């Protein structure tokens, strides 16, 4: 019997892609394939690609070309495969298979077919699959953190975004399925679950006829996981019911990732997000009133077609006014297949880059000021790494999401994968510094009156 080939994975892109990669690893391992972290030693490399913006495509193509030039057999999975299947098959003879964004559960069958000499194109025209708790999964995050996908796909048609074309219509998992997987992850020692989808506040709309995020959060409150974090919360979906569920569910962090994209009503209308322009300020103010300790992250696009200096200043003032904890800014990238690619009055590349840099410069003193407000506080920190040269522990407090926000550098003994209480001693623009709290610190904290 011929031995099965050894497989390595090259993961690119977002956390949704990461979950797809984790399921493919789990399925192949269950089927008896060897998984090697070293691409040089593997017989086949599965590259799970990203195609969200031009820079992501370029990174994906560079990775594919480097592997092809080294003589590797390649399976191209993910968004680039979904987007450019014909070109990839024509231009990369080393590609033995393509796997679409809704087809990763077929990876074992795909590999088996390639072993018999077939060149496989496993891409569904309309992605419709979503994994549940029964599909094997091998996590690639640190042991204490897991992403938990609640839905896949998107029914919105923002002018700049290719995601609905690449990932299909929204399809939500059942509450029972999500809670079951959360319990599995808790049993593995996970301390933090990060809820993800394209629009998490729309969770359940397709399945139940109405958004059900509030009910899902309350159900997850019964799972033995200390931290539950919400990503991709659209502002108009933050209803009083959702805000109440965040406030009243003990393990749901008051951390919200709000993909606002812009502030000016004219640009939001051009982005096909006209509903947002008149509610941004009001929703953020209501959030801060209802959740005084809320940590707010958002992302913006600089240089969208038609963006004038007036529009740009409006966005800059919006950032200054609301003092977000974390801000990411992308220069607009025109994407084939989106409405924005044909919009008039494109902004020159050098202006887009300059505006992006200016927005980040606007945010930096705000971020540093908000971080420095943590100095002297006792906070829980999830310890994830040990610095190889200094021995400092590296973790995150509740105000930092994995991969996209800052970290906390911690002096003192602390076990990896555990929450420890840390006194914050210093801060900079992106990170905090602290030391493991002493018994005296903890005693003094216990004597303080509750501020709740």
Swiss-Prot record:
Q: Cite the SUPFAM superfamilies for this sequence.
A: Radical SAM enzymes
Instruction: Work out whether the entry's keyword set contains Transferase.
Output: yes
Please name the PROSITE patterns in this protein's record. Answer: MTTASE_N, MTTASE_RADICAL, RADICAL_SAM, TRAM
Q: Which SMART domains match?
A: Elp3 (SM00729)
InterPro entries for this protein: Elp3/MiaA/NifB-like_rSAM (IPR006638), Methylthiotransferase (IPR005839), Methylthiotransferase_CS (IPR020612), Methylthiotransferase_N (IPR013848), Methylthiotransferase_N_sf (IPR038135), NA-bd_OB-fold (IPR012340), Ribosomal_uS12_MeSTrfase_RimO (IPR005840), rSAM (IPR007197)
Gene3D superfamilies linked to this entry = Methylthiotransferase, N-terminal domain (3.40.50.12160), Nucleic acid-binding proteins (2.40.50.140), tm_1862 like domain (3.80.30.20)
- Start and end residues of each MTTase N-terminal domain: 5-116
Q: Which residues form the TRAM domain?
A: 372-438
Q: Which GO BP terms apply?
A: tRNA modification
Q: How is the cofactor bound?
A: Binds 2 [4Fe-4S] clusters. One cluster is coordinated with 3 cysteines and an exchangeable S-adenosyl-L-methionine.
Q: What is its EC number?
A: 2.8.4.4
Q: Where does [4Fe-4S] cluster 2 bind?
A: 154, 158, 161
Tell whether Cytoplasm is among the UniProt keywords: yes
GO cellular component: a single term: cytosol
Give the Radical SAM core domain ranges: 140-369
Give the subcellular location.
Answer: Cytoplasm
GO MF annotation: an example: 4 iron, 4 sulfur cluster binding
Q: Please list the cofactors this protein needs.
A: [4Fe-4S] cluster
Identify the residues that bind [4Fe-4S] cluster 1.
14, 50, 79
Which reactions appear under catalytic activity for this entry?
L-aspartate(89)-[ribosomal protein uS12]-hydrogen + (sulfur carrier)-SH + AH2 + 2 S-adenosyl-L-methionine = 3-methylsulfanyl-L-aspartate(89)-[ribosomal protein uS12]-hydrogen + (sulfur carrier)-H + 5'-deoxyadenosine + L-methionine + A + S-adenosyl-L-homocysteine + 2 H(+)
Per UniProt, the keywords (alphabetical) are: 4Fe-4S, Cytoplasm, Iron, Iron-sulfur, Metal-binding, S-adenosyl-L-methionine, Transferase
Pfam families from the entry? Radical_SAM, TRAM_2, UPF0004
Question: Which family is it part of?
Answer: Belongs to the methylthiotransferase family. RimO subfamily.
The UniProt function text for this chain reads:
Catalyzes the methylthiolation of an aspartic acid residue of ribosomal protein uS12.
Give the protein name, as stated in the record: Ribosomal protein uS12 methylthiotransferase RimO
What is the gene name? rimO
């Amino acid at each position: 019997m011929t031995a099965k080939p050894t497989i390595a994975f090259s993961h690119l892109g977002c956390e949704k892609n990461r979950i797809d990669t984790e399921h493919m690893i789990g399925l192949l391992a269950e089927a008896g394939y060897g998984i090697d972290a070293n691409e040089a030693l593997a017989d086949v490399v599965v590259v799970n690609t990203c195609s969200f913006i031009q820079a992501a495509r370029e990174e994906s193509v560079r990775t594919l070309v480097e592997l092809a030039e080294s003589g590797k057999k390649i399976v191209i999975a993910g968004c680039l495969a979904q987007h450019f299947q014909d070109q990839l098959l024509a231009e990369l003879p080393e590609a033995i298979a393509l796997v679409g964004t809704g087809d990763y559960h077929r990876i074992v069958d795909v590999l088996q077919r390639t072993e018999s000499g077939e060149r496989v194109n496993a891409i569904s025209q309309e992605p419709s699959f979503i994994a549940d708790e029964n599909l094997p999964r091998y996590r690639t995050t640190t042991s204490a953190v897991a992403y938990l996908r609640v839905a896949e796909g998107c029914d919105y048609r923002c002018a700049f975004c290719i995601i609905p074309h690449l990932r299909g219509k929204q399809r939500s998992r059942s509450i029972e399925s999500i809670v079951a997987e959360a319990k599995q992850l808790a049993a593995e020692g996970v301390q933090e679950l990060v809820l993800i989808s394209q629009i998490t506040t729309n969770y359940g709309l397709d399945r139940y006829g109405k958004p059900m995020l509030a009910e899902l959060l309350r159900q997850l409150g019964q799972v033995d996981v200390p931290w539950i974090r919400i990503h991709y919360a659209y502002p108009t979906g933050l209803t009083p019911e959702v805000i109440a569920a965040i406030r009243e569910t003990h393990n749901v962090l008051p951390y919200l990732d709000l993909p606002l994209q812009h502030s000016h009503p004219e640009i939001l209308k051009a982005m096909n997000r006209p509903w947002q322009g008149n509610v941004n300020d009001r929703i953020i103010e209501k959030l801060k009133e209802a959740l005084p300790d809320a940590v707010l992250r958002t992302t913006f696009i600089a240089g969208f077609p038609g963006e004038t200096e007036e529009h740009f200043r409006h966005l800059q003032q919006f950032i200054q006014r609301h003092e977000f904890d974390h801000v990411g800014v992308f220069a607009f990238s025109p994407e084939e297949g989106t409405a924005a690619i044909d919009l008039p009055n494109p902004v020159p590349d050098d202006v887009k880059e300059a505006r992006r840099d200016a927005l980040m410069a606007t945010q930096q003193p705000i971020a540093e000021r908000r971080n420095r407000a943590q100095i002297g506080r006792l906070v829980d920190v999830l310890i994830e790494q040990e610095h190889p040269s200094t021995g400092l522990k590296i973790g995150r407090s509740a105000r930092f999401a994995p991969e996209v926000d800052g970290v906390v550098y911690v002096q003192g003994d602390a076990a990896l994968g555990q929450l420890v209480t840390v006194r914050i001693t210093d801060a900079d623009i992106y990170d905090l510094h602290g030391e493991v709290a002493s018994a005296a610190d903890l005693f003094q904290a216990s004597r303080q009156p509750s501020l709740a």
